[in-house]
């Protein structure tokens, strides 16, 4: 977990540059493949920490979520993604960190608060995992817990049509 922790306090200049390059490529590809339209972008804080809480239907949701702001977005991902070395390295370099699903992963919650305390925004999918269909599934309370602990707002985000672009 040391590699993950090294990226929590703002990340290195290389990590930030890597994020910017990858984000721009992914957002460009999303714009080419989809009809991305961001509504009420002005409601996303230009500075300070906040939690971006999108609905999760597809693997394309994370890059789409980063389209709402040019700021670096930090995120959690299922820990199994970090077990594949190159994937885990890339996710960590992009500002991600693992969460053990199915348990109350206190370390991941502490990392969330640390990211927010450092002033960076954080993407948390309140449904916990990718779901199917247009209905919003029951939400886990992790995003609300972290928001209260860190004293930051939650910005809800709806993403329509991503399941058609990249099905579960």
Task: Locate each region found by the language model.
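Compositionally biased, charge-rich terminal segments
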Residues: 1-17, 79
